[in-house]
Amino acid sequence: MNRKAPTGILGFPVTPFDNQGNIDELALSQNIKYLLDSGLEAIFVACGAGEYHSLENGEYESIIEIATSTVKGQVPVYTGVGGNLSDAVHKAKLSEKHGVDGYLIMPAYLINGEQEGIYQYVHSIATSTDLNAIVYQRDNVVMNLDTIEKLVEIPQIVGFKDGHGSMEHIIEFTQSIGNKIGWLNGMPMAEVTMPAYIPLGFDSYSSAISNYIPHISRKFYDALLEGDETTVNEIYQEVILPINRIRRQGKGYAISLIKAGMEIVGLPINSNNVRPPVTPVKKEHYEQLEEILKKALIKYPSNLTKSL
């Protein structure tokens, strides 16, 4: 087992549904292949963007099978696990059964546990299999240094994904723990904050826009690493910040706006097909995104883009 967290740009594919509400398995496979062809360094299925909260166990298992058969070992495949502890452990074992590389331990939503409770929750999941595990901090699951230091002693834990955004805490974590684990930026629209995270030791991020304009996220990240401030600022102003402004207009847009972007560029998905409580993108916001992408793809064309 390679005890190392993925680095670079991480793909978090959405789960496409057909008009009857079932998983569109062909579309899922095609969209994962699109991410692979675009050079993403890892695939994380059935996580937040994949509407993990809405998936039945059978659907979850099907998604894993599709992901592993499509990826075929080209890059690491991770799954999302979380929710109630027994279900999280069950999904962790399903993931191990189907040969994935690891899983992202999602926050236990709506439960504000003490630090010891958070530790026991993560420990129970991480030690239930021999797979790599990445801890995800966001919303109501915010850890202190003592908790993180205890967690990194668990051999299965290879990474920490931050979706909380407290620079003071992150500096304390990275300075105290160093390279014992990998550091992943999991903030909403992670491209927005990646320039602040790189100097702290973060060398990967989950990219929502890579589901539909992966070449632009790649160009942005390469420019960051190369110190090309002109390109960074251009992509910030023309693509990233405008899309982020739309994303903030609706709850659930972290998912449905991805589907809208995919549909706009011609990928096989119906952006209206999301599961409650997520709702589709409103018409005005869809049109705003469409206009941004039209301009972006003129300036930054892609051979993989099928539309526009």
UniProtKB/Swiss-Prot annotation:
Pfam assignment, any one: DHDPS
Keywords: Lyase
Enzyme Commission identifier(s): 4.2.1.41
Catalysis: reaction(s): 5-dehydro-4-deoxy-D-glucarate + H(+) = 2,5-dioxopentanoate + CO2 + H2O
EC class name: lyase
Disulfide bonds: none
Listed pathway(s): Carbohydrate acid metabolism; D-glucarate degradation; 2,5-dioxopentanoate from D-glucarate: step 2/2
Transcription recorded as keyword: no
An example Gene Ontology molecular-function term: 5-dehydro-4-deoxyglucarate dehydratase activity
GO biological process: D-glucarate catabolic process
Classification via NCBIfam families: KdgD (TIGR03249), PRK03620.1 (NF002958)
Family named by the database record: Belongs to the DapA family.
Entry protein name: Probable 5-dehydro-4-deoxyglucarate dehydratase
Lineage, highest ranks first: Bacteria, Bacillati, Bacillota, Bacilli, Bacillales
